[in-house]
Amino acid sequence: MNKALPKAIFLMGPTASGKTNLAIELRKRFPVELISVDSALIYKGMDIGTAKPNAEELLQAPHRLIDILEPTESYSAADFRRDALKEMDDIVAQGKIPLLVGGTMLYYKALLEGLSPLPAADADIRAQIEQEAEQFGWEAMHDQLKSIDPVSAERIHPNDPQRLSRALEVFRISGKTLTELTQIKGDALPYEVHQFAIAPKERAEIHRRIELRFANMMEEGFEAEARALYERDDLHADLPSIRCVGYRQMWDYFDGEGTLDEAVFRGICATRQLAKRQITWLRSWKELTWLDSDDIDGALELISTQLEKK
């Protein structure tokens, strides 16, 4: 008889949907340990603008894979999968259930489905692409991608140079499109995964929460936190850490683009767009149970019922 797979919980959702609060409540009721699934929370010194769980919350529910890198460093979906699997194995060895909580959908996908055999980054080719973009513009580079890989071009916005550059880089290195290569799957996750997504029923409520969160961040000193990063000699606007929503807009403000109020407004708009993309991705997710962030007791009951199923 096959040995039963260990359980794991995915707690997904758009930004500002209440994932952290629900995760803390889950830890009070179930033998779970938390793993952060967030491409911004990995960075040290980026606490306020990422809405990182505060000291009290981390005391109640420690999160693994938070504060593991300097903002100068990069971190891929492959890096996350490697680290998350290690943490999950450690949690299971303690007789507990891994609870993965966050909103970086690409990380969840990589963990659940395995990774496609994409080529490693090539600094020379990346530099060549960036040089072409500087000469012709990212719109022209997007047109180039459209002629090679229309499926990826449909998904990638011309104003997303990181993903656009990567799609072109993959083709130039391998001779195959990103679409072709991502259809080849890696190893599936060896866990019995219970997948949940938490969000308010009304989109307007997400917008309200985002605005409130941004206002709170500014009161807590986000401008000073972002400026401290801006004044470091080892950081620049093209790093993944500084491209995080909120930080990118503050960086532009420090560079002289507009007023502080305008930077805050742009940050709110960018966060709304992020939430919209997260929800769109989740709507296409398979085997997902939706939870109402305005009914935490109901959410806990639903999760409890699912975990008790064999």
From Swiss-Prot:
Root EC class: transferase
Keywords: ATP-binding, Magnesium, Nucleotide-binding, Transferase, tRNA processing
Gene3D superfamilies per record: 1.10.20.140, P-loop containing nucleotide triphosphate hydrolases
Source organism, top-level taxon: Bacteria
Site residues by UniProt (Interaction with substrate tRNA): T104, R126
Residue span of region Interaction with substrate tRNA: 38-41, 162-166, 243-248, 276-283
Its EC number(s): 2.5.1.75
Keyword Transferase: yes
Function: Catalyzes the transfer of a dimethylallyl group onto the adenine at position 37 in tRNAs that read codons beginning with uridine, leading to the formation of N6-(dimethylallyl)adenosine (i(6)A).
Name of this protein: tRNA dimethylallyltransferase
Lineage of source species: Bacteria, Pseudomonadati, Pseudomonadota, Gammaproteobacteria, Vibrionales
